[in-house]
Amino acid sequence: MQRLKKSEAKQVVGGLSFWSFSAGVIMIVNAFSTLINTALDISEAANANNANGNGSSYSYKRRNSQKDYFSTGRFRLGLTPGKSSYSFPV
């Protein structure tokens, strides 16, 4: 096996650290956007629930939005549609 020169080794380590940093930034941005989307989903459901005194508008909206559940932040975080406990969706 051929040993790398010091300058070549620095270049390899620099490249690896750049890609590791880039992946970390992408993961952090993805996590924040997921949290923001989840908060918006939850607040939207809460606002819809309070829009009508008997909650009929919320149940109608919820029934229609269950098909879109897989695109929500709650699904991405692993939260079930009807509970606040954490579980992996399978």
UniProtKB/Swiss-Prot annotation:
Predominant subcellular localization, coarse grouping: membrane
Protein origin, superkingdom: Bacteria
Membrane disposition: Single-pass membrane protein
Annotated transmembrane regions: 12-32
Entry GO terms, CC: membrane
Subcellular location field: Membrane
Keywords: Membrane, Transmembrane, Transmembrane helix
The name this protein goes by in its record: Uncharacterized protein MG220 homolog
Source species: Mycoplasma pneumoniae (strain ATCC 29342 / M129 / Subtype 1) (Mycoplasmoides pneumoniae)
Lineage: Bacteria, Bacillati, Mycoplasmatota, Mycoplasmoidales, Mycoplasmoidaceae
